[in-house]
Every structure is written in structure tokens, then in C-alpha cells.
């Protein structure tokens, strides 16, 4: 990584794309004498999303400017903020953040050896730090503490004392990390000015504060971990990235509150110094922009179409996400992710036989059904009636699926076809080949038996979820236990309607693009 030379060049790198700097003169004075020490902290709460690339790209700028950069995993802050991270999950979430932030930095080419990583609890539970918390609490008013956290700490009618402590701890971090400057979003401004007011009262120096703008989410508001359509998760599949970008607010010619343009400005341009608009030759072919202002001007004048802008962002974003997805595909990190962010709907069942135990709920949302694309079909080496298919369901590798369709569907009709796959059956070997799912098909009633694979809408992507109308919000089981016979109990009410639509209890099987159907077997069963 090349570094800037000279105080002015370093200053430009440190401050580019920032919304505000408190302490500009002090920053320049330090740059004339030595390298600047900066820290960025992140509370280990919800899953990081693609907006985290905004601070990551600035951290890359800081390193190019020769700064000494510390990344703080603020685990104690995560607990203090209205218990956004429960105490029992604190360690797991901190480990998750460490892995995902490092994967993001590696994805954009930041050398990790140039960074210092530290957890809040490594020093915030020390005797000295704790004494300073008490000293600070003796001079800070309740009004100032509440005001400082208003944009950051979760606001409730009756705030907990922990939320009032939060700004003071963040202020003390500047002293205990021995930095010249703290970097964060402009939503942290009140905490930064709080620190500037109160640290000197303890005899500590006032620090420089560097503030990023808040990047609009895809809906045009702040990108939020709690608004599913507003954010793109770092581990989202390519199909989900496409789907969320497709929904993004990006009105032709409108450059105000445009989350897609904002992401290009604050993430993609700083990382590559250029951005390529991908489009067909008949629309002018690809065009490379070396200045964001030129791209914004062309979009405002409708020279660049929103569809081309979204497709180009999708391609660039997936290049950043691919190495992160690959890293988190390991069994260890999959296990960590599930442990750090357990499914809240999966409450611990009552003890069997206790008076609080209830019959298990059998609902279709427990089935993990997805659209799949058949990428290859071969005859089973040891069974004439079976196919062995490779089916893409939006995972890093296609699944191997064994199907008894040889007598009903010619091989060439399966190749490259979209199918509907049940993905959470327990894998089982069929004549020596492990099958990792089941292709759902319509079957005729009576003889001669006819079988047709179910058809999703033609525009669907591999991996897209299939659900039953009215049950779209439930979470599927990780794996269906054979002894529970969940699928078998639900399957008893699967039917093909008179309109050839797949149904459960007269409720349609759906994707976001429409109904699941079959070609002709009205009134048939589904298996």
C-alpha cells in the first residue's frame, strides 16, 4: 500500500469525503511533526452490513496517510446500549465482529499487520479505568449524558442507567487508547463534543474528531441493521444482493437521497479511483468514470440509466463480498455465526412431560424450500431409474441430489431447468450417492402415473425462497428430524389446484415473483 508524502497530501487523504472535522488546525500541526494516531470503534451488536465498507475505506485512507490506526471492538458498549448484545452472547458476537471486520479489510486490500485490534473489556474493567468512570460521573450532568447519546444509544421512555454511562466510556477510550483522534459517523457528533467538554475536567487532552456522513440505505434512509430491505448483509447471496438492489430507490435523474449513488461515492470510488458503468453496446457500451462528480452529473442528466447503475454496483459489490462469503463458508465460522446470532423464533422447548410442554407446531414455514437451477444431470452409476443432479440453490457449491425421474422426465428437459428443491431434509445415501435435497414434483392420481417437476416463475434466481401464502415470515428448521415426520405431515395436504398451482391447504406456494405451478397435472399430489 503506497503512502502519501508531505503534511498537506496526508491531510487531504485523511479528510477526503468526511462531513466534518473538529480540530483541523491541531491535525495539521501534528502532521508537520509526526504520524497521527487514530481509532475507530464499533459496538458489537447487530450483524455488520455493506455500509461498514464506508469506514473501512476511510481506514484505508488513514493507512495511506501513514496514520497509526487502532480498531476497537466495543463489547462493553454493546451491552450498555440497552443490552443490544446480551451478556451471554457478548463474547461470541465480539469474535464474529473480529472475523468479519478483518475479512472486509482483506477484501479491500488493507494489510492487517498495519492495524492494532483491541477489545473494550481488555482495559475497560481495569482499576484505573473504573476509577475514571466514577470521576467522570461526578462532573457529568444527567442532561448532558442523555443528550450526548441521543443519536447513538437506543432511546426508550425510561432509559437505563447503562445508556447514560455509554458516552462517558467512549470519551475515556480516547485517553486509554492514547490516540490523537477518534473517527466515526456524524451521528456520533454529540458524543464527540461531550468528550471535548468533559475530558479536560479530568486533566486529559481534547482530541480531534473526524466524522463520516451517514450513507443513505437502499430505501433512501439511513442504512440500518434492523430494516431488512434497507441493508445488504455481508453474507447475503448474490441473488439477494440483486433483489435488494432491484428494490433500491434510484429515480432517473434524482441525485438526492440516492443510496446507490452514495455507495459509489463513499465506498467504490475511494477504493478503486474509478467506476465502470456496464451496459450493452446498443446503449453506448461500458463507460469508465475517473471522477465521481462526472458520474453524478451524467446520472442527473439521465445519460446513465438507473438499471445500468444498479447492475454496475451489483457487479462491483459482489467482487468485495465474494472473499468474505468464501471465508465464512468454513464450518467453524458458520457455527460461530449461528451461535452469535441465534434465531429468536427458535425458543428453547419445554422439557418433555412437563405441564408447560406443548405439541410441536407443524407449519410450512419449517420447510426450507428454494428455487434451484439444474446445472448437470447424469444417470446414477448403480441405478437405472435414478438421476444424479447438481443443483444450484444459491450456495457456494451446487448440491448433489438423487431423483427417481428417469422414467418420467428426459435428461435434456432437466438440464438448465429451474426446479423447486426441499433443502433441509437430512442428507441420505441412495445407492451409494448422498442426496442433499429433494426435487418437488407433481404426480397424477391413478395409472399410468405421470410426474412433472414443479415450475417456479421463469424470472426467479437460484436460491430464492419458496413459501406458503400466509407463512412467509417463519424460519425453517436447520434440518428436519426424520422421527418427527414434519415433512410427511405437511405433505398430506399438498395438492395441485385446478389451475395447476401448487398448494398446501388451498394456500398457494409462492416466490416473490409469483406462484409455483406445474405444466398439466391438475388435482395431482406433490412429493
UniProtKB/Swiss-Prot annotation:
Family to which the UniProt record says this protein belongs: Belongs to the class-I aminoacyl-tRNA synthetase family.
Biased composition (Basic and acidic residues): 348-358
PANTHER family: TRNA-AMINOACYLATION COFACTOR ARC1 FAMILY MEMBER, TYROSINE--TRNA LIGASE, CYTOPLASMIC
Organism: Gallus gallus (Chicken)
GO biological process, alphabetically ordered: tyrosyl-tRNA aminoacylation
Subcellular compartments: Cytoplasm; Nucleus
EC number: 6.1.1.1
Domain-related comment: The nuclear localization signal, which mediates localization to the nucleus, is also important for interacting with tRNA(Tyr), suggesting that it is sterically blocked when tRNA(Tyr) is bound.
Top EC class, one word: ligase
GO molecular function (one): tyrosine-tRNA ligase activity
PROSITE patterns hit by this protein: TRBD
Reaction(s) the record says it catalyses: tRNA(Tyr) + L-tyrosine + ATP = L-tyrosyl-tRNA(Tyr) + AMP + diphosphate + H(+)
Subunit description: Homodimer.
Sequence motif Nuclear localization signal, residues: 242-247
Annotated protein name in UniProt: Tyrosine--tRNA ligase, cytoplasmic
Amino acid at each position: 500500500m503506497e503512502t502519501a508524502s508531505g503534511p498537506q497530501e496526508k491531510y487531504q487523504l485523511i479528510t477526503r469525503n468526511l462531513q466534518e472535522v473538529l480540530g483541523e488546525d491541531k491535525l495539521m500541526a501534528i502532521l508537520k511533526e509526526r504520524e497521527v494516531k487514530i481509532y475507530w470503534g464499533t459496538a458489537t451488536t447487530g450483524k455488520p452490513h455493506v455500509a461498514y465498507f464506508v469506514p473501512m475505506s476511510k481506514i484505508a485512507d488513514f493507512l495511506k496517510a501513514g496514520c497509526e490506526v487502532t480498531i476497537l471492538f466495543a463489547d462493553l458498549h454493546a451491552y450498555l446500549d440497552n443490552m443490544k448484545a446480551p451478556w451471554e452472547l457478548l463474547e461470541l458476537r465480539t469474535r464474529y465482529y473480529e472475523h468479519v471486520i478483518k475479512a472486509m479489510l482483506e477484501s479491500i486490500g488493507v494489510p492487517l499487520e498495519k492495524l492494532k485490534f483491541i477489545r473494550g473489556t481488555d482495559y475497560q474493567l481495569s482499576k484505573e479505568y473504573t476509577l475514571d468512570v466514577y470521576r467522570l460521573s461526578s462532573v457529568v450532568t444527567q442532561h448532558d449524558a442523555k443528550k450526548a447519546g441521543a443519536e447513538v444509544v437506543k432511546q426508550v421512555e425510561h432509559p437505563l442507567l447503562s445508556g447514560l454511562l455509554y458516552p462517558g466510556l467512549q470519551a475515556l477510550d480516547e485517553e486509554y487508547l492514547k490516540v490523537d483522534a477518534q473517527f466515526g459517523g456524524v451521528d456520533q457528533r454529540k458524543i464527540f463534543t461531550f468528550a471535548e467538554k468533559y475530558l479536560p475536567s479530568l486533566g486529559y487532552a481534547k482530541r480531534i474528531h473526524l466524522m463520516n456522513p451517514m450513507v443513505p440505505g437502499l430505501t433512501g434512509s439511513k442504512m440500518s441493521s434492523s430494516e431488512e430491505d434497507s441493508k445488504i448483509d455481508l453474507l447475503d447471496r448474490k441473488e439477494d444482493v440483486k433483489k435488494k438492489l432491484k428494490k433500491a430507490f434510484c429515480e432517473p435523474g434524482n441525485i438526492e437521497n440516492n443510496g446507490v449513488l452514495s455507495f459509489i461515492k463513499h465506498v467504490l470510488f475511494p477504493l478503486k479511483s474509478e467506476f465502470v458503468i456496464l451496459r450493452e453496446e446498443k446503449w453506448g457500451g461500458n463507460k469508465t468514470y475517473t471522477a465521481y462528480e462526472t458520474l453524478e452529473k451524467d446520472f442527473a442528466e439521465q445519460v446513465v440509466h438507473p438499471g445500468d447503475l444498479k447492475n454496475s454496483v451489483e457487479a462491483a459489490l459482489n467482487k468485495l463480498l465474494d472473499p468474505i462469503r468464501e471465508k465464512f463458508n468454513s464450518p467453524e465460522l458458520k457455527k460461530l455465526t449461528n451461535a452469535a446470532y441465534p434465531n429468536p423464533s427458535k425458543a428453547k422447548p419445554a422439557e418433555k412431560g412437563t405441564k408447560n410442554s406443548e405439541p410441536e407446531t407443524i407449519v410450512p414455514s419449517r420447510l426450507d424450500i428454494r428455487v434451484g437451477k439444474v446445472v448437470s444431470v447424469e444417470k446414477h452409476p448403480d441405478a437405472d431409474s435414478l438421476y444424479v443432479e447438481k443443483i444450484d440453490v444459491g450456495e457456494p457449491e451446487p448440491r448433489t441430489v438423487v431423483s427417481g425421474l428417469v422414467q418420467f422426465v428426459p435428461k435434456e428437459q432437466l438440464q438448465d431447468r429451474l426446479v423447486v428443491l426441499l433443502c433441509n431434509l437430512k442428507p441420505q445415501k441412495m445407492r451409494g450417492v448422498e442426496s442433499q435435497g429433494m426435487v418437488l414434483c407433481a404426480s397424477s392420481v391413478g395409472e399410468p402415473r405421470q410426474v412433472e417437476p414443479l415450475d417456479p416463475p421463469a424470472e426467479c434466481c437460484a436460491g430464492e425462497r419458496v413459501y406458503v401464502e400466509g407463512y412467509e415470515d417463519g424460519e425453517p428448521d436447520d434440518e428436519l428430524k426424520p422421527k418427527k415426520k414434519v415433512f410427511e405431515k405437511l405433505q398430506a395436504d399438498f395438492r395441485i389446484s385446478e389451475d395447476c398451482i401448487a398448494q398446501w391447504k388451498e394456500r398457494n406456494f409462492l416466490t416473490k415473483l409469483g406462484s409455483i405451478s406445474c405444466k398439466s397435472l391438475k388435482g395431482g399430489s406433490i412429493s
